[in-house]
Amino acid sequence: MRFAQRPAMPERRSLPVLSLRDTVLFPGIATPITVGRLKTLRAVEAALRVEGEDKRIFAVAQRDAAEEPTASGLFSIGVIARITQVQRFGSGLQLVLYCERRAAAPRYTEVDGVIRAPVIELADLPLRPEEDGALEALSREVRERAVEYGRHRGAPEDVLKQFVGSMYGPAELVNHIAFYLDLPTPEKQALLEILSTEERMRSLALHLYRQIGIVETQEKIRTTVEEELGERQREIYLREQLRAIQKELGEEDDENAAARLEHKLQRANLPAEILQEARRDLARLRRMGRETSPEAQVLMTWLEWVADLPWSQRTDDHVDLDRARAILDEDHYGLGDVKDRVLEFLAVRKLRLEQARSEGERSRAISRGPILLFLGPPGTGKTSIAESIARALGRKYVRVSLGGARDEADIRGHRRTYVGAMPGRILQGIKRIGSKNPVIVLDEVDKLGASYQGDPGAALLEVLDPAQNDGFVDHYLGLPFDLSEVLFICTANFRETIPPPLFDRMEPALFAGYTEQEKHEIARKYLLPRQRKECGLREEQLRVTGTAIGGIISGYTREAGVRQLERTLGALARKAARRIAAGEIERAVVGADDDVKELLGRARMRLERRLQYDQPGVATGMYYTQMGGDIMHVEASVMPGKGDFVLTGQLGDVMKESGRAALSYARAHAAELGVPSDRLQRRDVHIHVPAGAVPKDGPSAGVTMAVALVSALSGRPVRSDIAMTGEITLRGTVLPIGGIKEKVLGAHRAGIFEILLPADNEADLDDLPAEVRSSLEFYLVNTLDEALARCLRLRSIRLEAPEEMPHARAS
């Protein structure tokens, strides 16, 4: 072998060595390379540290596929490659190399874990004049054989011709074809080491002839085998393959599957008529076989469902009221009214079961109970208290989320004729837990929808009706299934969006939300210990004082429940855990508002607070939403004008009508209120409810609007320490409204301790927690003049009785 040296390269510094497994690179090739081994990564990093664009590396193949390359395990001839692109992924690198020249490494040295080598460029031997003709003939032969080889491999012929035609010189042609040819590493390395272009092309042509012969032989063998296999032999062969595949996948043949299904049906203790129907379909399955009909798989899936449903499996009820009370208290703080209602419900079931003399009477005693509806804001414990009921009864628990359900098939399932048909969610849950008498929570029934696919709310009517659900027929099953022993509990946030026929089947239990004191205790006893555990903290590593918990409740949450409170405590625990894990602190004690602010940032919530002083035209009202109750300041302003009346604040129609009723009342009784009669004619009146981006509606702002309006007209300031609510009529009568508990709790949270309510709402005060009720003073009014006297600090406002309306007389 002859070597030709150029003088330029020996002057180059030694290059880092990139060892390649099962890859030989040739000059003129640009190719991506994935680097992941430690030594190769070090070599690439050493090459990349070179200043400027001279980021070159010596790429050489390994003699074997060893994981840790050594100097003795590398060939001596490789290529000098320039690194053109680098992309990191995970712990490795993706490179694009352009191979510039062939080179030899007389020796390898390893310094600081990087293999380096002084490289000497190896140029191709110069061509002799007599070699030109032979080289041209060889080039044509290599091009033709390369196209033929690629065609056998499945590549398009036009693409192959374009590829080989783009090679300008013999050296470029032989290097590219040798790189892409499927040859063992030693044979490719031998091609790289040949410096004579003619010799290298002759060797490549021999390799191409040999590879083409191998491929043609493989094709002949395949054709001969396919011809020798007749139709019968082919069928036998395929069936044997199918059995082998089924065995590997753990599947059964038809007869074994049918026998297994028959055994399951016998053990399922099915009712007689259902067992008869199942056996009839099982006989059909045996006759058709799985391969002969697409219906066979549908039948098999249906029979699996019939056999797996718990037709007679149930759990025994253990109604122990003391244990039930202990479980409810253990899982939930507060909610006294709800717990009492649940215990009453369980007590009735206990007495009914004790009086039942037969299995039929026992079943009727279980099925005749009411359907409880837990109604209240998010995060107040509706779903979790249903789970506690299941624990108290010793029953299994299933939750079915119906939020956004718009298809009747969610309840009744799809008919078997549809592709991918499945039973409804009710039967899916019952099959999953394996009991016919679980506690099933139908979550978010107020968010059911309806579409062209049916109304799931209408489908629930049968499910929740004790007179019908003992024979509930799912569309997929097509057989009656007894749901009468299931204890259904529904949850919802809004009463108004539940379909009236569905609501009529339920008995609501109201979850009004928690007071700040209740939230404080829930955070201390339940939420904080849970978040400590989830973050891997011991009790002494994270302590949160009562003051800090109160600050979190008021400054970082605004809700009737405790869901956001738990998330905020979780964020607090995670930030403390990070500091402890980093070694910055040994334990965290959150004791003041500054500590909370340091960990959680500034407070995100701004609760409405009572006004600091009395002022005309501003009255404090109360409202409630699904997030709980709060206060609002209704503003009234009187200005020179033409008697126009303006209402702003994105008010609904009902609130606008309340404002107009208040204005009409003020005009009718201007003299008694001390308002000059001409003032209303020469003044414009503007009533505004702040937070204009939030839509508002409802009748309960009538009293507040009237007080603010009369205050603005008369110039008398409204007491800032009193909050009010109630609907008004044109005669000045104050009518009762709803949401008293939530509104009063919101006012109490805002620091207001005097509440004005309609007298007809007096009974609603019994729903208030004792600690809240004892700290407030209530004023119950029947008429608007009583409200004005109380809110404007007047002794009384005496209004004349309205004139009696004339009676209609029959002619």
Curated annotation (Swiss-Prot):
Keywords: ATP-binding, Cytoplasm, Hydrolase, Nucleotide-binding, Protease, Serine protease, Stress response. GO terms for cellular component: cytoplasm. Its EC number is 3.4.21.53. Residues 613-794 form the Lon proteolytic domain. Pfam families: AAA (PF00004), Lon_C (PF05362), Lon_lid (PF22667), LON_substr_bdg (PF02190). It is found in: Cytoplasm. One of its GO terms (biological process) is cellular response to heat. The active site is at S700, K743. InterPro entries: AAA+_ATPase, ATPase_AAA_core, Lon_bac, Lon_bac/euk-typ, Lon_lid, Lon_proteolytic, Lon_Prtase, Lon_prtase_N. PROSITE patterns: LON_N, LON_PROTEOLYTIC, LON_SER. It catalyses: Hydrolysis of proteins in presence of ATP. It comes from the Bacteria. Residues 15-212 form the Lon N-terminal domain. Induction: By heat shock. ATP binds at G376, P377, P378, G379, T380, G381, K382, T383. GO terms for molecular function: ATP binding; ATP hydrolysis activity; ATP-dependent peptidase activity; sequence-specific DNA binding; serine-type endopeptidase activity. ATP-dependent serine protease that mediates the selective degradation of mutant and abnormal proteins as well as certain short-lived regulatory proteins. Required for cellular homeostasis and for survival from DNA damage and developmental changes induced by stress. Degrades polypeptides processively to yield small peptide fragments that are 5 to 10 amino acids long. Binds to DNA in a double-stranded, site-specific manner. PANTHER family: ATP DEPENDENT LON PROTEASE FAMILY MEMBER (PTHR10046). Homohexamer. Organized in a ring with a central cavity. NCBIfam families: lon. Belongs to the peptidase S16 family. This is Lon protease 1. It comes from Sorangium cellulosum (strain So ce56).
